[in-house]
């Protein structure tokens, strides 16, 4: 995965995790999963609802927070592009 992908992805997922924001995760096959992000790494997201599911990032199409979030980025040297 490119460095730029991590610069966007990690702060977004980390904010959702830290603030316990409920999310809907849509998979590439159309299935909708709901819960809170418990943890994540380069390849997977742990999604907690009644149970914790390990969801592979390559299967994720879209992550939709239940409310607006402000992404805390470490390095603000790069603009939106």
Swiss-Prot record:
Biological processes per GO annotation: regulation of DNA-templated transcription; regulation of RNA stability; regulation of translation, ncRNA-mediated
Keywords, A to Z?
RNA-binding, Stress response
Q: Which InterPro entries match?
A: Hfq, LSM_dom_sf, Sm
Q: List, alphabetically, the GO terms of the cellular component aspect.
A: cytosol
One annotated GO molecular function is: RNA binding
UniProt function note: RNA chaperone that binds small regulatory RNA (sRNAs) and mRNAs to facilitate mRNA translational regulation in response to envelope stress, environmental stress and changes in metabolite concentrations. Also binds with high specificity to tRNAs.
Q: What is this protein called?
A: RNA-binding protein Hfq
Q: Which species?
A: Aromatoleum aromaticum (strain DSM 19018 / LMG 30748 / EbN1) (Azoarcus sp. (strain EbN1))
Q: What lineage is this protein's organism placed in?
A: Bacteria, Pseudomonadati, Pseudomonadota, Betaproteobacteria, Rhodocyclales
């Amino acid at each position: 995965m490119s460095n730029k992908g991590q610069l966007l992805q990690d702060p977004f997922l980390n904010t959702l995790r830290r603030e316990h924001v409920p999310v809907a995760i849509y998979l590439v096959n159309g299935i909708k999963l709901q819960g809170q992000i418990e943890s994540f790494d380069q390849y997977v997201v742990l999604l907690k609802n009644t149970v914790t599911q390990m969801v592979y990032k390559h299967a994720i199409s879209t992550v939709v927070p239940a409310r607006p979030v402000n992404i805390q980025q470490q390095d603000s040297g790069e603009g939106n592009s």
